[in-house]
């Protein structure tokens, strides 16, 4: 274990090594990062979280620092869908400036309080500046997040037009070089697999079931006997099965997992949606063409089905269910009818090579996630300008140092955008502060970024700062770092 200044320095070194690899991807003139793979061609990407997840440092203590910032990137991606590189850049700036002051004798606890105070004020400002989105704004946000690719921006805007802003958009690889949209019937609800052993795609930790039977149980299931016939049928016909239940007995779940691992049973068990459970279950039953599986009704009489089901750690998506919802939708309120009637837009991504396909999928995924964040909370001026215009709270003592650390860190995103474009960061930042204009790094012009369509989702801008400040505060107040005991090699 290590203590005091040495502990913080080693953590900082790890933060810097990871952040330096990630931040080269920021902005319209950001660079690619080439990542070695275990098998096949290297992965080329501008996706910050992909880069962050690929960095491993030999020094254990430095790697702990890198892991802390890696978590910032991952959490920002999970919370807001984008902004992973911005969060990393902000975290690095706060850590470096903060540790200078801690080393000089400032109280780290008071510095952290000042940082938290500043972040609270800034996030309220970001919320107040947010503009609701329309389809033109959606296209602009998607274009910027896709590394300023207007074709991808238009593609995603078209997808949302087809299924509305409350609809579902997913992505798959095309069988050709063309990239196109297909709208199918389906729905999505918040839930996840009950065990990671159900995962079939370890690249994105998802479970994909082709042409599965769907069984919906609005109750706890605890007796394997009532499902034996269906499970045997699935095993014999090599058919997948998706089970949705309110609760599952641990022994029953273990039995299904063992059959999944040892016997290749294509099964996944998910918990019923928590939010508006009864409504959502009714919709699932209608879409899949099944019935509720009760203790009185034989399970085989209750099965529905769909063309495909995708289960991630956050959502379950059912595509092209076997049910006919035409009459069912007529009796629903507008919100539910829109959710079911809108369907699912699938973007099939095509490219000329596997390397190009992987890079393009990264950019489209970023664009979809950023667009969803913009729909949630609106948009603000991009290019780092919203951070520079944010007001700061008054503070005294070492808390004032914390506020000033955040003030300086707020320059970091625009500074990095400029450096990636080999532009004079100090001059550009000074002019943005002096005027009401922002800097468009793509055209290298000062202009009204809202009118120019240079927009960032407010949710991304807010979440990136909150997560960066949170982990930076932890590093500043760290006094000891302990590494795991090394297991002796046999």
Describe every region a protein language model picked out.
Residues 11, 27, 81, 105, ...:
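Residue-level signature of catalytic and energy-coupling elements of molecular machines
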Residues 3, 9-11, 56-63, 261, ...:
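Extended, low-charge hydrophobic alpha-helical regions
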Residues 101-142, 208-211, 216-217, 300-320, ...:
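A structural-propensity feature for long, helix-poor, extended segments
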Residues 41-77, 194-206, 211, 217-229:
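Glycine-rich oxoanion-binding loops at beta->alpha junctions
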Residues 123-377, 381, 481-490:
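Long, structured protein-protein interaction/assembly regions in large complexes
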Residues 42, 89-96, 120-123, 127, ...:
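Core structural elements
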């Amino acid at each position: 274990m290590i203590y005091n200044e040495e502990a913080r320095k080693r953590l900082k070194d790890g933060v810097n090594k990871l952040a330096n690899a990630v931040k080269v991807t920021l902005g319209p003139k950001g660079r690619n990062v080439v990542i070695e793979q275990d098998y096949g061609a290297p992965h080329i990407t501008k996706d910050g979280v992909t880069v962050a997840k690929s960095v491993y440092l030999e020094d254990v203590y430095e790697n702990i620092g890198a892991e802390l910032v890696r978590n910032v990137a991952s959490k920002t991606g999970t919370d807001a869908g984008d902004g992973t590189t911005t969060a990393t850049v902000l975290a690095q700036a706060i850590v470096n400036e903060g540790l200078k002051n801690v080393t000089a004798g400032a109280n780290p606890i008071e510095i952290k309080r000042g940082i938290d105070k500043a972040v609270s004020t800034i996030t309220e400002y970001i919320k107040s500046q947010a503009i609701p989105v329309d389809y033109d704004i959606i296209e602009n946000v998607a274009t910027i997040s896709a590394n300023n690719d207007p074709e991808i921006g238009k593609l995603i805007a078209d997808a949302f037009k087809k299924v509305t802003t409350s609809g579902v958009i997913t992505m798959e690889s095309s069988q050709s070089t063309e990239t196109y949209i297909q709208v199918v019937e389906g729905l999505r609800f918040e839930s996840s697999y009950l065990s990671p052993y159900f995962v079939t795609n370890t690249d994105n930790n998802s479970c994909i079931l082709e042409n599965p039977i769907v069984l919906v149980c609005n109750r706890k299931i605890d007796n394997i006997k009532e499902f034996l016939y269906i499970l045997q049928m699935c095993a014999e016909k090599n058919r997948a099965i998706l089970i949705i239940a309110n609760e599952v007995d641990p022994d029953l779940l273990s039995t299904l997992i063992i059959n999944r691992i040892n016997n290749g049973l294509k099964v996944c068990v998910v918990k019923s949606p928590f939010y508006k459970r009864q409504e959502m279950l009714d919709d699932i039953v209608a879409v899949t063409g099944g019935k509720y599986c009760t203790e009185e009704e034989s399970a085989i009489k209750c099965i529905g089905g769909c063309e495909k089901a995708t289960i991630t750690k956050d959502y379950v998506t059912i595509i092209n269910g076997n049910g006919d919802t035409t009459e069912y939708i007529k009796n629903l309120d507008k919100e539910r009818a829109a959710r079911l009637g809108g369907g699912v837009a699938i973007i099939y991504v095509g490219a000329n090579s596997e390397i190009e396909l992987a890079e393009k999928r990264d950019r489209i995924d970023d664009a979809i996630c950023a667009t969803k964040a913009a729909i949630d909370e609106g948009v603000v001026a991009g290019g780092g300008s919203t951070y520079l215009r944010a007001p700061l709270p008054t503070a005294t003592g070492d808390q004032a140092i914390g506020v000033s650390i955040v003030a300086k860190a707020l320059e970091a995103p625009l500074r990095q955008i400029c450096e990636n474009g080999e532009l004079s960061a100090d001059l550009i930042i000074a002019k943005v502060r002096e005027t009401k204009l922002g800097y468009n790094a793509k055209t290298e012009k000062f202009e009204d970024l809202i009118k120019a369509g240079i927009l960032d989702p407010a949710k991304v801008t807010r979440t990136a700062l909150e997560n960066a400040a949170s982990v930076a505060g932890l590093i500043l107040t760290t006094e000891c770092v302990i590494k795991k005991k090394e297991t002796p090699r046999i």
